[in-house]
């Protein structure tokens, strides 16, 4: 494949753009080539003119800073480089290729098998445990932000734009996240910490098994009302083939009382996660 337009600083063309592989609210994601090393990367280029308020600008600053805080972890997309100009910010990251997001897989094929879900759950929790150890709270765990490397079924968490750094014992406030996956304490305006990520992860995993989220509504307001009611159900028609151990695990994460909700480390010790991989099936 031919790579043409160049990106670089100080008249040094460090990267060549090969193709666009994604597009979002603030810009594009491209596959780029670094001639000096022969490596390929994913480049998220953000158009600063598209940032409409202080929250957008904070997200712009957050992602590279938070990703740089985290040492290498196999289940987190790694940052490689940054090019900041007056008009754009380009974040160069590990290229996960070929890959598919959990969201795209749900749209194309529906539910996941339970062994597969348990294996992916373990990797998601390992990534969150690593983040929380460094004080990083993602705050937007959702299927779109979880990639699967199709070469080896490795899960990679990405997009830290909504994230925040919290010191030990610190909490924060503010409604951040995506309607189906946001924790109830966030919606209530309470102070919160890292356990919001565990709620979101639980909702993602429920959705992988059921093909639909546990709290549904036609509008954001209806979804928020369902989340705040917190009536977690496992309809027999949908969950007939899902183990009681898996349902117990989900109850530990999708727990309205954050003080009783599992941390990432506690979740990793749950029997359902401990047994993950015993009958694992390949991701297709």
Swiss-Prot record:
Catalytic reaction list: L-seryl-[protein] + ATP = O-phospho-L-seryl-[protein] + ADP + H(+); L-threonyl-[protein] + ATP = O-phospho-L-threonyl-[protein] + ADP + H(+)
Consequence of gene loss (knockout): Retarded growth and loss of light-induced phosphoenolpyruvate carboxylase phosphorylation, but little or no effect on the metabolic flux through the anaplerotic pathway.
Broad enzyme group: transferase
Superkingdom of the source species: Eukaryota
Keywords from the named record: ATP-binding, Kinase, Nucleotide-binding, Pyruvate, Serine/threonine-protein kinase, Transferase
Protein residues bound to ATP: 21-29, 44
Induction: Up-regulated by light, cycloheximide, phosphate starvation, carbon availability and high pH. Down-regulated by phosphate and phosphite. Not under circadian control and not affected by nitrogen supply.
Pfam families tied to this protein: Pkinase
Reported tissue expression: Expressed in rosette leaves, and to lower levels in flowers and roots. Barely detectable in siliques, cauline leaves and stems.
Matches recorded under InterPro entries: CDPK_Ser/Thr_kinases (IPR050205), Kinase-like_dom_sf (IPR011009), Prot_kinase_dom (IPR000719), Protein_kinase_ATP_BS (IPR017441), Ser/Thr_kinase_AS (IPR008271)
Activity regulation as described: Constitutively active and not activated by phosphorylation.
Gene Ontology biological-process entries: response to cycloheximide; response to light stimulus
EC number(s) stated in the UniProt entry for this protein: 2.7.11.1
Residues annotated as domain Protein kinase: 15-273
GO molecular function: ATP binding; protein serine kinase activity; protein serine/threonine kinase activity
Family statement: Belongs to the protein kinase superfamily. Ser/Thr protein kinase family.
Note: Lacks the autoinhibitory region and EF hands found in calcium-dependent protein kinases.
Functional description taken from the UniProt entry: Calcium-independent kinase involved in light-dependent phosphoenolpyruvate carboxylase phosphorylation.
Descriptive protein name: Phosphoenolpyruvate carboxylase kinase 1
